[in-house]
Amino acid sequence: MTRQSATLATPSDENAHPVRARIIQHARQHFLMHGFRGVSMDDLAVGLGISKKTLYAHFASKAEVLKEVIHTKFGEVEADLERLASADGASFPSRLQQLLECLQGHLKEPQPPFMRDMQREPEMFAWIQTLRRERIQRHFGKLFEEGRRAGLIRKDVPPKVVIEILLGAIEAVINPQKLEELELTPKTAFPIIVTTVLQGILTDKGRS
């Protein structure tokens, strides 16, 4: 697969085309649940009940379909995080909890078969890691800075360090092999990791 840009472009108007949108939705459900390496364009066409000609009229290859699935997924992540981070009147603990719950919810969708396939596509995997890092740094970094100024996060722990710890925790949560070793699932692992991280960075005031 070709090298991807680190940022996501604004979704094009053609994504609003009902057939194209249906292709993306069908591929998303299948890819994220069962993986994508064993799926052909023929399989997608059959599953959608459309001709290969129609499928290829919208996407030139499976790689393009996969890229659009990821584009759509991270567009939703960005919109949700932005909405929660900019909520007026919400306290620091409330906003942090909401952001973490949002992140956990989005991490539930990609299943181990997808992650295994993705790890065999180094450039695409690196692109996803970059997209994830950008969003966590932007939304959580800003919130951690606010919490630090309010005396809710320890001043001796730089927000950048907290971000790296959180990113490392997420990498562990979505690594199928690591989860198998720990006998955990993403659903059970994420709360454990988050609780451990937060207990280490919050002040007594932040925990109260």
Predicted segments, located by residue:
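Short, Lys/Arg-enriched C-terminal cap helix and immediately downstream tail that follows
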Residues: 67-68, 202
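Short secondary-structure transition hinges
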Residues: 104-141
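Basic, helix-initiating cap at the start of DNA-binding domains
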Residues: 1-34, 38-47, 63-67
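Hydrophobic alpha-helical connector segments
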Residues: 68, 82-109, 159, 163-166
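Hydrophobic/aromatic-rich alpha-helical bundle segments in the mid-to-C-terminal region
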Residues: 115-119, 126, 148-194, 204-208
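Short hydrophobic/aromatic patch on the recognition helix
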Residues: 49-59
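Short, basic, alpha-helical segments at the C-terminal edge of helix-turn-helix-like DNA-binding modules
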Residues: 71-78
